[in-house]
Amino acid sequence: MLQHKILGLDVGSRTVGIAISDIMGWTAQGLDTLRINEENNELGIDQLVDIIKKHNVGTVVIGLPKNMNNSIGFRGEASLTYKEKLLEAYPSIEIVMWDERLSTMAAERSLLEADVSRQKRKQVIDKMAAVFILQGYLDSLH
């Protein structure tokens, strides 16, 4: 059993998908999607800190998008910046960067296979991608 829950984040330019672990650290469930505006530096960090405190989270796993050649591109740099902003606001949180290559595509494929409408997919895709990121991390622990 974990001492604290683990949060998974899929950071985009307009949204942050959020997933949370169960207390045993076995499964990831979609929790929320934060609306952000990266261009205006409105990153939802205060809202995220509230979620961390409310759910007794000790570790945050942030998806790190890498190129297929393992280099870090623009979106990867944005995720690293998000990590730094979160650490500034909440220095005691442990943050793990997790290779998220293909997580959004896997989430999209799952939703398509479940015959979820395009409208509904747009609403849940970021949260689902966060679930894939967090579940990958949780699986690596066991």
Curated annotation (Swiss-Prot):
SUPFAM superfamilies: Ribonuclease H-like
Keyword Hydrolase in annotation: yes
Domain of life: Bacteria
GO biological process: rRNA 5'-end processing
E.C. number: 3.1.-.-
Keywords, alphabetical: Cytoplasm, Hydrolase, Nuclease, Ribosome biogenesis
Compartments where located: Cytoplasm
Consequence of gene loss (knockout): Not essential, it can be disrupted.
GO cellular component: cytoplasm
Recorded GO MF terms: nuclease activity
InterPro entries for this protein: RNaseH-like_sf, YqgF, YqgF/RNaseH-like_dom, YqgF/RNaseH-like_dom_sf
Family: Belongs to the YqgF nuclease family.
Free-text function comment from the UniProt entry: Could be a nuclease involved in processing of the 5'-end of pre-16S rRNA.
NCBIfam families in the cross-refs: RNAse_H_YqgF
Protein name: Putative pre-16S rRNA nuclease
Organism listed in the record: Staphylococcus aureus (strain NCTC 8325 / PS 47)
Native organism taxonomy: Bacteria, Bacillati, Bacillota, Bacilli, Bacillales
